[in-house]
From Swiss-Prot:
Entry's Gene Ontology BP terms: plasma membrane acetate transport; sodium ion transport
Record flagged with keyword Ribonucleoprotein: no
Protein name: Cation/acetate symporter ActP
Transmembrane segment boundaries: 33-53, 77-97, 103-123, 148-168, 183-203, 206-226, 262-282, 303-323, 355-375, 404-424, 428-448, 464-484, 493-513
Lipid biosynthesis is among the record's keywords: no
Cleaved signal peptide residues: none
Amino acid sequence: MKRVLTALAAALPFAAHAADAISGAVERQPTNWQAIIMFLIFVVFTLGITYWASKRVRSRSDYYTAGGNITGFQNGLAIAGDYMSAASFLGISALVFTSGYDGLIYSLGFLVGWPIILFLIAERLRNLGRYTFADVASYRLKQGPIRILSACGSLVVVALYLIAQMVGAGKLIELLFGLNYHIAVVLVGVLMMMYVLFGGMLATTWVQIIKAVLLLFGASFMAFMVMKHVGFSFNNLFTEAMAVHPKGTAIMSPGGLVQDPISALSLGLGLMFGTAGLPHILMRFFTVSDAREARKSVFYATGFMGYFYILTFIIGFGAIMLVGANPAYKDAAGALIGGNNMAAVHLANAVGGNLFLGFISAVAFATILAVVAGLTLAGASAVSHDLYANVFRKGATEREELKVSKITVLVLGVIAIILGVLFENQNIAFMVGLAFAIAASCNFPIILLSMYWSKLTTRGAMLGGWLGLLTAVVLMILGPTIWVQILGHEKAIFPYEYPALFSISVAFLGIWFFSATDNSAEGNREREQFRAQFIRSQTGFGVEQGRAH
């Protein structure tokens, strides 16, 4: 377990979705016309889907959840498409390329949050909620305070993710396509807004499904060609890789990346519980018809992602053989052109030529679009459904709520483009780590305890949730990444890079303490309502109509 956690800790920079796929300065490449043509085909096709979806979006349910008509298999593919990022593909294969076996430990460790979602969250979440996870958290608690907290937690996570995605998208596209950074950021922002604005969840779902299929096909082809090169023998694969890698046989030894078990444990908890608190992932469970389909969604998604991460392991070792030992992919200093994160892209060229390189480059761009579309819809629903329709203007009509949601999409898109430009040369690696920490420290404890702990009260959820959120933010600021590397101080006040271990503990302890000491009449009433909520969560009685929060 210690080896797993230490590998996880070292690998977080590779997990920063598209943001960390390319970090620091990049060398702009010649214009890749094959990639641009393939990407244009993808854009035209998905815009056609958006037009088709726009004709079917007639209600709030259609816009937020595609009318609940997505099947478990389709939703599983869409979840995989939402979760498998550009850096999952480029970053993990790069980790295998540089560190060998530790990359496999990390890629499998990336899945540890999904059993929690499958066994503890998916079924009850679908039975209790309608559009956002705040529907579940506020089921028996006070609507206003809980929805404000849930919306704030969602928006902070979405904002951090969006900034990271936009910066990563600009740098990645500049490297792969030869396009100007600013043009790339604007292009991603405009396409993102079009998908969500006109097609809602239905268009977003199909963009994610198409992206997942393309990514799985591309990775499968690369892995197949690598295995064909070694006669479909893993022994030959590892032997040839060890023969050409600078570390030799050491690449087959796990646990050599970091020596700090506290940071490793903190990161492991952040990734595990943070996955179960990501608003754009949780929102996908409301797109299916019932709890059975929700469980099937997680089952299929976990299968697709597990298969994908195994492929990245083969791709990483293939890159060691076919890219690392080939001087054509090195610069004058002997380093990989574009950095180690480009190992998979160079391998695409090695096994499939320029045409397949163009395909993989286009898939990387499509990957970013699928993720930012899901994030934008989650952020818009938090504003329009949780804040506008249930806090600031109760009783708002569906038309008014949808209008606010679409305005929010435009605002989020413009803000994402502006911040993507402003953060071009900034270190944004910490943002995804902070997003996971906040999701794990604020969203996850409230969701879990609202469904499973009968003694939870509004006071406990509010105080504990805000404490968890603020603790994660403050400790991240005081830690080595921001306090030393960005702000330039000599020594960090908080010695660990990842705050999740401490902020999650603060959140759970705060929720428990302030709920246990809540003797108010309102608190007692909320405890008494747990039984009715429990029955609903187990049986799904009334789920077809949903609760009108």
